[in-house]
């Protein structure tokens, strides 16, 4: 795959359920709707434990770590195609999954003015008319996937059940998707 890679990353998370302080909420279908995506603060000691599970060559890079929940039942079963404008890639360690598929697109990247944008969270939805789906993967609980967040991508839940997807996310600000992937390949 060009825009996603399954990697060997399994952090110890004995206290992850304590991550309850909300850092940000976004991806609402309307102004008064519940947020689809909520990011939670992870205490520093827990973040340090997560960092030690990374390849040693990545432990001192500029990263942001949080716990994220996505409730696709609030948003027509999908998180529309979007790109991130701050970090270059993200490592998702999936705590709970429900048959969601992540798809990547190629084509002209234009903001979609009809969908709420980032609320300061540094991402925006993109117009799908000029995009073509090029690859898709399904993540499972306990897996870790590295994603190229500058490439348009979408999360779609295939099941009728609207369970919350729960994950730990590690955002890499200064390294590209390909650079981070190489660090994981060398570490194996």
List PLM regions with ranges:
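Non-heme Fe(II)/2-oxoglutarate
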Residues: 1-78
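Secondary-structure boundary elements
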Residues: 55-61, 96-101, 175-178
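Short His-Asn-centered micro-motif
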Residues: 67-68, 82-84, 93, 147-150, ...
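Catalytic core of non-heme Fe(II) oxygenases with the double-stranded beta-helix
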Residues: 72-144
């Amino acid at each position: 795959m060009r825009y996603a890679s399954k990697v060997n990353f399994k952090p110890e998370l004995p206290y992850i359920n304590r991550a309850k302080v909300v850092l940000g909420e976004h991806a609402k279908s309307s102004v008064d709707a519940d947020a689809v995506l909520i990011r939670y603060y992870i205490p520093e000691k827990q973040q340090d434990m997560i960092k030690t599970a990374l390849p040693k060559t990545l432990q001192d890079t500029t990263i942001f770590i949080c716990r994220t929940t996505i409730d696709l039942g609030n948003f027509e079963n999908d998180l529309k195609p979007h790109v991130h404008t701050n970090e270059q890639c993200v490592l998702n360690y999936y705590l709970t999954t429900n048959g969601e598929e992540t798809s990547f697109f190629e084509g002209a990247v234009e903001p979609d003015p009809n969908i709420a944008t980032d609320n300061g969270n540094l991402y925006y939805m993109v117009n799908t008319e000029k995009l073509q789906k090029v690859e898709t993967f399904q993540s499972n609980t306990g897996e870790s996937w590295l994603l190229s967040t500058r490439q348009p991508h979408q999360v779609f839940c295939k099941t009728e059940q609207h369970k919350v997807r729960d994950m730990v996310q590690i955002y890499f600000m200064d390294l590209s998707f390909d650079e981070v992937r190489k660090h994981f390949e060398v570490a194996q």
